[in-house]
Design a protein with these regions (language model features):
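Nucleotide/phosphate-binding catalytic cleft detector across ATP-hydrolyzing
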Residues: 1-36, 40-66, 70-159
């Protein structure tokens, strides 16, 4: 009897880094794609607010002596605490002057790509084009920052 050869599944994840949302897409089966979206937003809160976050069942990360809430939860907490949300991306580029931008972007990216399914799994990513009001804006630095972030999470990045 002949042996039937089965092809190993192809792994890989697509990552769209947009100004409003960061979205990943991954094959979940034959002709099926699953997506995960996170809002490109965060809020920093005092450690004293930890109890409120726990009671609200909101995920957070402790960073540099403060609590960081990301995504849609950040919008909800901003309303609750009457605070403005912060954005790590501004007009498609890493927000200049936002000290936590790279750390928060790493959290947001990991939130949607998760752990690699195989060592050095491929991650194909896109970054926003230069802003329409400033087409001369070079996005090379920003693309390379995302390449670094993705590699730090165990993926082989491809812009």
């Amino acid at each position: 009897m002949g042996m039937k050869m089965t092809k190993e599944p192809d792994f890989g994840v697509g990552l769209d880094i947009g100004t409003m949302n960061i979205v990943s897409a991954r094959s979940t089966g034959p002709n099926k794609v699953g997506t995960i979206r996170v809002r490109d937003a965060f809020i920093d809160l005092d450690v004293a607010d930890k109890k409120t976050l726990r009671l609200s069942k909101v995920d957070y990360v402790e960073m540099d002596g403060q609590l960081i809430v990301i995504g849609d939860s950040a919008l909800n907490m901003a309303n609750l605490f009457k605070r403005e949300i912060r954005r790590p991306l501004l007009k498609g580029i890493i927000a200049p002057g936002e000290l936590l931008a790279q750390q928060v972007l790493s959290l947001l990216v990991f939130n949607v790509i998760k752990e690699p399914m195989t060592p050095d799994e491929h991650c194909f990513f896109s970054v926003p084009a230069p802003p329409l009001d400033d087409p001369s804006q070079d996005t090379t630095y920003h693309r390379e920052i995302f390449r670094k972030i993705i590699a730090e999470h165990g993926y082989t990045p491809h812009p």
